[in-house]
């Protein structure tokens, strides 16, 4: 079960990475509908596949571009006269948003992101079945409870993904989508810990728990602020502001995110420093958290001083997610130590 949980966690990290690449490349609307892509199960690769062609056959739900508008076929039809068919209601303009652009790169980047998201459902269902069987067998239901929570968040994030597309990447919904993905990872950490806790506990210093809890809250807040900064960068990019001018063009509140990183660093160190001489598995956790924290600060400095390099954006996000998970994992051990 632990191996399957780790697989699910690794796949979720891949989805977070893919989602960050989608944002980095501006591919969020590469597929204008959900769950299909231009009404197709396999996305188009050429513009001719999404433009009206006389004499072509189209299935119901097929989406085409014409006159800078996205049109949806209302029935299966052999199309011969677009205007006549539009007048009779066989083609209807898509009304959930007005985004009508086809970019094959964006389409496939978004499709791969969705495909990875769908594949995460496989280990989620396997975990649900496995933990239920284990609960019946050994009367230990905590892993099953975590598996249910995990599946709930997975379904909710999938639904939010649809809402994000339908709303043409409504800004705050993207942040909520990211927090949902974070909740999926936290539920997996809880599941893994519920299996792990019967095989030994980690000795922790009681005085570090308070600082760790504060560090977790501040790091999540930084993650939310960072997502909002990223959305502002997207707006600047769409407005064709030069990359070198992005920092200067950001709203003043982004400095809260920039300066807040040093507060997060200080608070994280408050629980890490007393454990610097830890042994065993705790030593590994402390080293991992320290490495994630250092790399997170480094990529933040790169953003400010080197014009927000595109490659650093997904790395920065993954490091933040990893740091949050490390905090959650240690807090779970603190809780187990109390019970």
Model-derived features: positions:
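Polytopic transmembrane helical bundles with strong interfacial aromatic enrichment
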Residues: 1-339
């Amino acid at each position: 079960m632990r191996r399957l949980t780790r697989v699910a966690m690794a796949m979720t990290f891949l989805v977070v990475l893919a989602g960050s690449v989608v944002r980095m490349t501006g591919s969020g609307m590469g597929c204008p509908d959900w769950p299909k892509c231009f009404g197709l199960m396999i996305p188009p690769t050429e513009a001719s596949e999404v433009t009206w062609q006389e004499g072509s056959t189209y299935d119901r739900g097929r989406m085409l571009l014409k006159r800078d508008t996205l049109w949806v076929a209302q029935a299966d039809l052999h199309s011969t006269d677009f205007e006549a068919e539009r007048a009779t209601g066989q083609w209807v303009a898509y009304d959930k948003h007005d985004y009508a652009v086809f970019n094959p790169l964006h389409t496939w980047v978004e499709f791969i992101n969705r495909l990875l998201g769908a594949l995460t459902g496989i280990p989620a269902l396997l975990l649900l079945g496995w933990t239920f069987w284990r609960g019946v067998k050994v009367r230990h239901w905590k892993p099953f409870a975590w598996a249910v929570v995990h599946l709930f968040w997975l379904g909710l994030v999938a639904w939010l993904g649809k809402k994000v597309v339908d709303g043409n990447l409504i800004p705050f919904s993207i942040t909520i989508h990211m927090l949902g993905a974070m909740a999926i990872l936290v539920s997996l950490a809880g599941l893994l810990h519920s299996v792990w806790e019967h095989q030994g506990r980690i000795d922790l210093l009681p005085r570090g728990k308070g600082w760790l809890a504060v560090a977790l809250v501040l790091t999540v807040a930084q993650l939310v602020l960072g997502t909002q900064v990223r959305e502002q960068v997207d707006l600047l990019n769409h407005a064709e502001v030069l990359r070198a001018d992005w920092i200067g063009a950001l709203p003043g509140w982004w400095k809260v995110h920039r300066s807040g990183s040093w507060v997060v660093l200080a608070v994280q160190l408050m629980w890490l420093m007393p454990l610097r001489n830890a042994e065993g598995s705790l030593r590994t956790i402390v080293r991992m958290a320290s490495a994630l924290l250092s790399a997170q600060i480094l990529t933040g400095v790169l953003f400010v001083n080197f014009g927000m390099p595109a490659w650093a954006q997904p790395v920065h996000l993954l490091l933040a997610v990893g740091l949050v998970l490390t905090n959650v994992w240690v807090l779970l051990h603190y809780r187990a130590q109390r019970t």
